């Protein structure tokens, strides 16, 4: 396994030291050059005698500058090695890019896989199914009514035989006035029901008529007795029987009329009407004065 030498040498301490040295050298080199120039110029103006630095001093300065430059070049080489794009580094970058692309694809595919797993889990029966609660009686009745009347509660209106006869009679006498829509609106049924009634010739039998009359008579008695209990009607007697609708319709038989004999008036109770200013007429005379 190949190990990069530059990466071995690169540590945090070395990098900080290199940066610090470069800053110091740049400052020192600039200051030394400026100082030497200022010193030489000042000496030239102050005295006519020329002074020259010794060879040993110049050699020491040159060695110091060369050492600093070599250190700078070494640091620059390290940085260039790190930042340079070699074939190995390009291959590594390609691998890294491939790995990142694969990771992104995996991340994108994870939600789909999770959804599929969630769907599969939902299709599978639960391990601990919840116990079904016992439904209330009204809930059972409501469900039964909904199943029975899916379109809602719209009961059919059943017309009595009298209404059927009335519809046929009105249409037969005045068909222009009592049309099918008018009859449907009047009797609160559909026009189709009116058409069927007009086409049919159904009539109730005698037994059905008799049962219907008995039912209505019983209903009349119950209503009247209830109103008597509430005090809205007086007890039924002869004076109420005279104006009874049931008697007029023939539901009640008329009682036999009792004949009362008139008693003759007695002479004592006979009243004699006479005028005091006139004399009584003789018994034998029949003339009128």
UniProtKB/Swiss-Prot annotation:
- Note whether Mitochondrion occurs among the keywords: yes
Q: Which UniProt keywords apply?
A: Mitochondrion, Transit peptide
Recorded GO cellular component terms are: mitochondrion; nucleus
What span is annotated as transit peptide? 1-58
> Which locations, inside or outside the cell, does it occupy?
Mitochondrion
Which positions carry the signal peptide feature in this UniProt record? none
Q: Compositional bias (Basic and acidic residues) at which positions?
A: 92-116, 264-281
Mitochondrion keyword on record: yes
Going by the entry's taxonomy, the superkingdom of the source organism is recorded as Eukaryota
Instruction: Region Disordered: list its residue ranges.
Output: 81-141, 250-289
Identify the Pfam families for this entry. Answer: Neugrin (PF06413)
As for family, the record states:
Belongs to the RRG9 family.
What the entry lists under PANTHER family is as follows:
NEUGRIN
Main function = Required for respiratory activity and maintenance and expression of the mitochondrial genome.
Put simply, this protein is called Required for respiratory growth protein 9, mitochondrial
């Amino acid at each position: 396994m190949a190990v990069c030498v530059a990466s071995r040498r690169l540590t945090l301490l070395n990098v900080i030291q290199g940066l610090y040295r470069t800053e110091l050298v740049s400052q020192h080199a600039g200051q030394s050059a400026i100082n030497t120039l200022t010193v030489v110029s000042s000496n030239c103006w102050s005295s006519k005698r020329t002074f020259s630095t010794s060879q040993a001093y110049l050699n020491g300065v040159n060695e110091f500058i060369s050492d600093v430059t070599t250190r700078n070049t070494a640091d620059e080489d390290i940085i260039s090695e790190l930042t340079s794009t070699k074939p190995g580094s390009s291959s590594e970058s390609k691998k890294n890019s491939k790995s990142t692309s694969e990771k992104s694809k995996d991340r994108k595919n994870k939600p789909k896989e999770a959804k599929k797993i969630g769907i599969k889990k939902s299709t599978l029966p639960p391990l601990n199914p919840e116990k079904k609660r016992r439904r209330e009686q009204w809930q059972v009745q409501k469900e039964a009514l909904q199943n029975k009347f899916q379109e809602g509660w719209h009961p059919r209106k059943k017309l009595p035989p009298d209404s059927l006869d009335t519809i046929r009679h009105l249409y037969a006498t005045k068909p222009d006035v009592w049309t099918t829509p008018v009859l449907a609106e009047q009797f609160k049924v559909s026009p189709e029901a009116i058409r069927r009634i007009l086409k049919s010739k159904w009539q109730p039998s005698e037994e059905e008529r008799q049962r219907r009359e008995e039912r209505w008579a019983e209903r009349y008695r119950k209503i009247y007795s209830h109103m008597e209990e509430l005090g809205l009607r007086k007890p039924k007697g002869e004076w109420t029987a005279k104006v009874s609708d049931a008697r007029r319709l023939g539901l009640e038989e008329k009682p036999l009329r009792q004949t009362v004999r008139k008693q003759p008036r007695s002479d004592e109770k006979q009243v004699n009407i006479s005028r005091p200013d006139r004399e009584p007429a003789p018994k034998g005379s029949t003339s009128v004065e």
